[in-house]
Amino acid sequence: MNIKMFVISLLLVSFGAQALIINENNPPEYQSFKSNYSDMIELANKSRLPHRVFYTSPSTGRNALWFDAVKHGDLNEVKKMLANGQDIEAKDTGSLDQTALGWAAFIGDEEMVDYLISQGANLWATDKGDVYNVFKSAVLGNNVNVVKKIHALMRSDIEINNQRVESDGETFIMIAASNNRIDIVKYLISQGADVNLVTTTQDTSLFSYNHSALSYACQNNLKDMQRLLIRNGAINHRTGTTSCH
């Protein structure tokens, strides 16, 4: 083991030691996380949403302990901290300024989401990663039940196919498709999501330039996502067919 890997291992062990064992099925250094290790890896990793990886090192900043409790899924600790005056709308300054609800929605911790909402957490919480409400945080995540719950609360204020909110014209189904969120894409389609919209940005330097849900699935080699979208009428606007090439 080289020095870098040794240091990382020590950090992970230290991180895991900060909380109670919540999930004994995880590798030892991740047993303090409620989420399954495999689910966390699927959610965010070096290749997918690397700026939202939350399980490799402790939180930093003024509210670090609060965000560690949220990320670990330690609901009892979250309740205690709120009872002792913790600001529920505090921002995770060591990351992208997410709120607790933003993190919980992304992680897909349904119990945590329910509790934070019951305590009045703001559904319009933003973060610096181009998130403008908690529904988008949930769509970036991978728990369709959380998406459904938040959508039910925000339905009258959110247009599934609105291309005016994101500066590049991305829609929720594009975001979910690009991150291989199969169940969420199915739900969005059931709610009327247009599978053939294309981003509106004219800035060719942007990653999102000239993309649709299917072109994202093609670019990221997401075969199951491609099949799902095509079954629901998607055409690759770049090829004029259902083909990626």
Features from the language model and the residues they span:
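Classical Sec-dependent N-terminal signal peptides that target proteins to the secretory pathway
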Residues: 1-21
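Ankyrin-repeat-protein effector appendages
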Residues: 20-62, 218-219, 223-245
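Ankyrin-repeat boundary/"N-cap" motif
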Residues: 57-68, 91-100, 126-135, 161-172, ...
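Alpha-helical segment of the N-proximal tetratricopeptide repeat
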Residues: 64-80
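Ankyrin repeat domain, specifically the short helix-to-loop turn at the C-terminus of the second helix
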Residues: 79-88, 114-122, 149-159, 186-194, ...
